[in-house]
Amino acid sequence: MNFLKKATPSLPETVADLKAVHPFYPVGVEIANFIANDKTVGQLLGVFAAGCVVILSATWFLASKAAPQLNKKDKLVVLWFCLSYFSYNHTRMGGAQDLFGQMWKEYAMSDSRYLTSDPFVLCMETVTAVFWGPLSFLMIYFIITMHPLRYPLQAVVSLGQIYGDVLYYATCMFDHYYKSLTYCRPEAYYFWFYFFFMNFIWIVIPGSE
């Protein structure tokens, strides 16, 4: 019996061990081949912000040169779809320890499903990467050239963004309330800033276009 007591750790010890493996929730969720980030949150956010400024500034400049007749609102729509293109495709641009991989792991603090091959998230991100990403890039061309299909395509892509976001929220809330599964860490900013605010943008802006 003494041997069994020594060989079998108590529940608190087991939970502590699991917490030490990775910081994601729910506690004990299996994250295959997890490697902790070697960059701080400040470094990741700084690089992300700088990257957005460079990409969007270059897009604004090129759009102004290619189509000087565009009004300010149309240029802002071009910036949105440019940002959409890079947002939808950045997860395929490298391994887990490159810049984008580490950003993705930081975001996963608010939703660990992105690191566990969750069926819904996997299917949703595949659809967005295959369809909404390239179509967002095509939208930039349609706006600049004033193509007659600009508004129909804009409606389709915007509806797809809203629909995907609503399902994203709904599936997470369903698991939380009906299965008692929480994918977000308990700190408030992970839920309100990462999970809620950063995704709510993809409902508000497409809905106002």
Which residue ranges define each predicted feature?
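N-terminal helical submodule of small eukaryotic multi-pass membrane proteins
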Residues: 3-121, 126
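Eukaryotic polytopic
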Residues: 72-101, 105, 112-209
